[in-house]
Amino acid sequence: SAHAADFVWRAGGAIALHQQLGYEVTIVCLSYGERGESAKLWKEQGATLDKVKASRRNEAKAAAQALGAHDIQFFDLGDYPLEMDRQAKFQLADLMRAVQPRFLMSHSLYDPYNTDHAYATQVTMECRMIAQAWGHNPGEQVLGAPQLYLFEPHQTEQMQWKPDVFLDITSVWDRKRAAIECMAGQQHLWDYYTNLAQNRGNHFRRNSGGQAGGRSARYAEGFQSVYPRTVDEL
């Protein structure tokens, strides 16, 4: 997550669902989004950078708790622009090794409105590569080949994002909505992402069979996978 709230809108359902299924989900916020994604907080009297960052941290921690996430970590790298030096990349790669994730989630590969998002995904792929390298901290367990799912951006057509996976999040929707409402600094997005989940629920129903026996998902999230999936049968 490039900023502290991104995981809530775009992958909150996936986080809550997989935690419920027995996974231990780790959330990484590369920044708090304190400069560029906290307009409501900056309009408050007496706002300072430290106060805004503290508010965003508290909101994100509350949202992660609402989703039941196993862990949330804040790298506090700053935003607008988000930048990571070699040491920060090693920090993320080492975390990937420690967690050994079954899969990863990040932003779309392209975002002309918010370059922090695309940068976060570029770095995620780079750190995945580093974590797979036997010559990085020799002797440690290297990372396998977890799939990278790109969660849905705000304006899909502009971001050249095309979903190939729909995830039914109906059973955990209440958790996601509770997490959404933790993000007081971006209240203008609450209803938008509720409507989006309903629309993706419609797409889930249609793509699972529609009126010919499709599953009755009310809420869903969409993802675009980066790497091929290896299967034993179709």
Regions found by a protein language model. Name each.
Residues 1-99, 232-233:
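Active-site rim/loop-helix segments in enzyme catalytic domains that contact anionic ligands
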Residues 71, 82-234:
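Metal-dependent de-N-acetylase/amidase catalytic core
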